[in-house]
Amino acid sequence: IDADGPRRLRLLVAPDGSAELQVLEHRIHGDTPWAVPLDLEPVPSEHEFLFHKTTVREVYDNARHRFPDAPDVLLWNERGELTETTTGNLVVELDGELVTPPVLCGLLPGTQRAELLDTGEVVERVVRREDLARVDAAWMVNSVRGWVPIEVDSAARPAGVSSSGA
């Protein structure tokens, strides 16, 4: 592998058992919080592909296309419950606890999330959109990037919309 800087590996396995190894750029996030918009549309909490790590990423891709300049997008379901981001699980500090939404809200049960629950570092609790006003801190977590601090960017504009709303 001829690479400048950190890389991550992705192993894709097809239904016929064939495999492909991809080498991808690994962005280092640093300590600066990512400005993450709240998606415009809810995700269906029972969408079958939200619960499995797969290349079928339509729900995530659609959110990213709505906000192409954002490093990530915060998702929520039809009940107004926060779920995850397009690249990882959500952890928020709320009422003095580190909280992650339950899988039944419609999200991938990531390996980093599972470890945090197993060690008791986080607890599961429904986090509603209106709870964002009370959140003391928030992170996107996954096993590749670790804990990435995020802040909800209410000023973010979807693709094709200027800051004047035109």
Descriptions of predicted regions:
Residues 1-166:
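Helix-start/capping segments and mature chain N-termini
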